[in-house]
């Protein structure tokens, strides 16, 4: 196997190659980083991931590096300012979702529920390494992502449908869907 072989969806953009090689499918256990990813996956709904990836630094800036306590304090006026920011996806419901999700995250913490433990419980705290001979076998959603979506919604999260949850699971390494010949498998 060539050390340069990557999943075919990566393409040639350096930002995408870097994301694929250093983040996608790598197990992430930090609760705040997991929170960032679930929020960003929600921003992707209906768009390509590269669109969100290119805007990630702008999201980090307006969300105080995805600090849930600071995000939860954001007001309608703050959202109005975000709507004027060309560095963000200017979709009010998606921007408001980040605030709602921060409040849901904090409510979980208040009840003694650790976000990382919660997320990883869906895969018994072990990454699932899938057999992926080619990307055509990778599902858009699974029973596990369906269960995660339902559990997140029950806790007050929004923009966390089954497909969004599966993309989240892939991105944070709950599942490894790198193709079998990928250098990152």
Predicted regions and their residues:
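HhH-family (HhH-GPD) DNA N-glycosylase catalytic core used in base-excision repair
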Residues: 1-185
